[in-house]
């Protein structure tokens, strides 16, 4: 059986990295992918999907340097998990657990807002 996903998209925000109690770094970032299709009237429509990406260890440390808006290649596996939120409601979450992340487009931090 195969559980493999490949995505190319734009970072929705700067990656957030933290260190677990055992010293293992773990990072998270959102990734936007887009798709275009023709509707029944023949007009092009764009859709955007948002993906939660999780990175571990050295990969988490490398991804800390990435910034919002950069184009990246992600390869990994789909992982589904459940958790209970602060209101006691059980939630289902789908993550992409990445084993490869490559920067495809370098974009520098800007001092201008917007």
Which residue stretches match the model-derived regions?
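Acidic, gly/ser/pro-rich intrinsically disordered tails
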Residues: 1-3, 15-24, 38-44, 61-64, ...
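Beta-rich strand-turn-strand
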Residues: 53-91
């Amino acid at each position: 059986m195969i559980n493999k996903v490949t995505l190319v998209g734009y970072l929705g925000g700067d990656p957030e990295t933290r260190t677990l109690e055992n010293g293992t770094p773990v990072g998270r970032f959102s990734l936007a992918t887009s798709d275009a299709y023709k509707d029944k009237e023949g007009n092009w429509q764009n859709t955007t999907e948002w993906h939660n990406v999780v990175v571990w260890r050295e990969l988490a440390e490398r991804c800390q340097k990435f910034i919002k808006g950069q184009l990246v290649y992600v390869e990994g596996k789909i992982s589904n998990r459940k958790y209970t939120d602060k209101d006691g409601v059980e939630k289902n979450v789908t993550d992409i657990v990445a084993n490869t992340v490559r920067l495809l487009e370098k974009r520098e931090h800007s001092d201008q807002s917007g």
